C-alpha cells in the first residue's frame, strides 16, 4: 500500500514538473519576442506613451528623419529636430524598461516619395554618407542612451543589389554599436505564372547581407487579396496562397526560407494595414480606397497573428504606425485592431 502511494506521489511530482517547465518555457518564449510599434515621424510623445500602454508592447521603433531632397538626390542630412525629439523619447522609454529600436528613416521630398524608389545618382557617395550618418547616430544616441537594436537600412529596394556595400556597413556598425544590428528589406511578390518574379525573389533570398546581421527584418506589406473584405480564414489561406491576380504566392513558405537558409530569426519590422476597404489588396497604400473599414484592418492583423504567433523562428513584429492620430493617419490601428494586437504575445 505504501509502495503504491509512493508511486502515485512520484508520478504527480513528475507531471507537475512537466507542466511547470512547459509554462516557464512559454513565458520565456513570450518575453523574448519583440512586440513593437513604429512611430509616425510627427509623433507626439504623450500619445506614444498611451499607445504603448493600449497595445501592450515592450519595444518602440524610434525613427530619426533623414532628409533627402528627391528620389535621385545625394543630399542627405539628419534632421536635428527629429534627433532631439528622439533623444527625449528614448530617455523616457528606457526609464520605463521599454526596449528601443533606432531607425534612420529616409524622408524623401518631405515624405511624399517612397524609399523603395530611392535611387541616388552617385552610389559610392551615398554609401559613404550613409555610413557617416549611422556613425553619428551610434555616437550621439545609440550607445549613449543604451539603444537595443539598430536598423542599418530601411526598404532601399533599388540599392539592395549592392551587397558588398551593405555587408561593409553592417560590419562597420557592429564594430561600433553595442546592441543588435538588422537590415530591413521590403516585401516582395511572386506569381506562379511570372518567372521573373521568382528570379527576383531568389536574388533577394541569396543576398549575403542577411548572413551578416543578427536577425532579418521584413516590411511585411504582402498583397494578399483583391476583395474589399475578407474573413480571417480567407486571409489565413491567402498567406499560404495569395488570391490577388491569381499569383498563388506562398508568403509563409517564402518567409520561412530566409530562416532555413540563414538560421536567423525573422522580424516583421513593419506590419500595417490601412483602415479601409481593400486593406489586404495594397497594405502599403493608405489611399487604397475612399471607404473606411476598421474591421477589415483588424482581420488582417488577426490573420497574421493566427498564422505566425506560435512560430519559433518569428522574432516578433512592429505595428505601423502609431504616435499620432491625425485625420490623415489611416494606418493608425482601429479599436478592433487594438484588441487583436494587445492580446498578441500576451
Q: Residue ranges of each PLM-predicted region?
A:
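N-terminal Sec-pathway targeting helices
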Residues: 1-13, 17-21
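Boundary/entry segment of secreted carbohydrate-active catalytic domains
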Residues: 21-57
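Aromatic-rich peripheral "rim/lid" segments of glycoside hydrolase catalytic domains that contact
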Residues: 37-40, 112, 282-346
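Short, acidic/polar
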Residues: 39-54, 126-141, 192-209, 298-307
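Substrate-binding cleft and catalytic face of glycoside hydrolase catalytic domains
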Residues: 55-73, 86-159, 275-281, 320-327
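Glycoside hydrolase catalytic-domain groove-lining segments
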Residues: 82-89, 96, 103, 175, ...
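Aromatic-lined carbohydrate-recognition surfaces of secreted/lumenal glycan-active proteins
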Residues: 101-109, 149-155, 161, 170-201, ...
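Substrate-binding cleft/loops of secretory-pathway carbohydrate-active enzymes
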Residues: 169, 187-219, 223, 276-281, ...
Amino acid at each position: 500500500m505504501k509502495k503504491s502511494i509512493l508511486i502515485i506521489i512520484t508520478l504527480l511530482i513528475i507531471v507537475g514538473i512537466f507542466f511547470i517547465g512547459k509554462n516557464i518555457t512559454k513565458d520565456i518564449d513570450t518575453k523574448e519576442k519583440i512586440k513593437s510599434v513604429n512611430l509616425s515621424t510627427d509623433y507626439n510623445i504623450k500619445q506614444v506613451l498611451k499607445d504603448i500602454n493600449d497595445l501592450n508592447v515592450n519595444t518602440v521603433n524610434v525613427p530619426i528623419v533623414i532628409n533627402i531632397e528627391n528620389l535621385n538626390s545625394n543630399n542627405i542630412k539628419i534632421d536635428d529636430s527629429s534627433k532631439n525629439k528622439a533623444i527625449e523619447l528614448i530617455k523616457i522609454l528606457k526609464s520605463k524598461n521599454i526596449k528601443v529600436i533606432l531607425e534612420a528613416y529616409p524622408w524623401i521630398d518631405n515624405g511624399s516619395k517612397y524609399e523603395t524608389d530611392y535611387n541616388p545618382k552617385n552610389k559610392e557617395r551615398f554609401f559613404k554618407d550613409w555610413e557617416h550618418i549611422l556613425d553619428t547616430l551610434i555616437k550621439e544616441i545609440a550607445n549613449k542612451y543604451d539603444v537595443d537594436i539598430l536598423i542599418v537600412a530601411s526598404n532601399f529596394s533599388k540599392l539592395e543589389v549592392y551587397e558588398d556595400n551593405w555587408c561593409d556597413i553592417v560590419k562597420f556598425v557592429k564594430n561600433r554599436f553595442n546592441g543588435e544590428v538588422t537590415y530591413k528589406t521590403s516585401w516582395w511578390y511572386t506569381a506562379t505564372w511570372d518567372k521573373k518574379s521568382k528570379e527576383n525573389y531568389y536574388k533577394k533570398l541569396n543576398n549575403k547581407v542577411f548572413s551578416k546581421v543578427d536577425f532579418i527584418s521584413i516590411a511585411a506589406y504582402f498583397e494578399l487579396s483583391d476583395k474589399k473584405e475578407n474573413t480571417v480564414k480567407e486571409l489565413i489561406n491567402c498567406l499560404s496562397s495569395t488570391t490577388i491576380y491569381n499569383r498563388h504566392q506562398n508568403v509563409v513558405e517564402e518567409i520561412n526560407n530566409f530562416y532555413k537558409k540563414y538560421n536567423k530569426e525573422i522580424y516583421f519590422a513593419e506590419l500595417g494595414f490601412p483602415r479601409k476597404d481593400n486593406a489586404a489588396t495594397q497594405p502599403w497604400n493608405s489611399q487604397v480606397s475612399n471607404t473606411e473599414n476598421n474591421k477589415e484592418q483588424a482581420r488582417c492583423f488577426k490573420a497574421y497573428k493566427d498564422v505566425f504567433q506560435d512560430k519559433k523562428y518569428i522574432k516578433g513584429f512592429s505595428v505601423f504606425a502609431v504616435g499620432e492620430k491625425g485625420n490623415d493617419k489611416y494606418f493608425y490601428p482601429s479599436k478592433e485592431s487594438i484588441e487583436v494586437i494587445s492580446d498578441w504575445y500576451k
